[in-house]
Regions:
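Charge-dense, helix-prone N-terminal extensions
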Residues: 1-99
Length: 99
């Protein structure tokens, strides 16, 4: 299973989400607000600044060029820990997009 597939499965359980397909992957929006994207073996999440700061201290993360509150996650291995982080950050980003 790929990171994109993991997130697509997780996002199916969330309400009020629109998937915008693009050549580089998919962007998920809640209402008009983008909150996550996936493609090319990586994902990006729009997180609360405090959550983003903590996320950037974990393996396989870096700042995203989408903005200061976005974190790029490109795990070397898609193990249980990577899946847990991706799903948690997806849910956090989705909740934040409602505000």
């Amino acid at each position: 299973m790929t990171l994109h597939e993991v997130l697509a499965e997780a996002v199916a359980d969330l309400d009020d989400v629109e998937a915008i397909e693009a050549t580089e992957g998919v962007e998920w929006r809640r209402g008009w607000r983008p909150f996550a994207a996936a493609g090319g073996g990586a994902a990006e999440f729009r997180l609360d600044p405090l959550v983003a700061k903590a996320a950037l201290r974990t393996p396989d993360t870096e700042s995203s060029n989408r903005g200061p509150d976005w974190v790029r996650f490109g795990p070397q291995a898609l193990d249980g820990h990577a899946v847990d982080r991706a799903e948690a950050w997806l849910a956090s980003a989705w909740r934040r997009a409602a505000t």
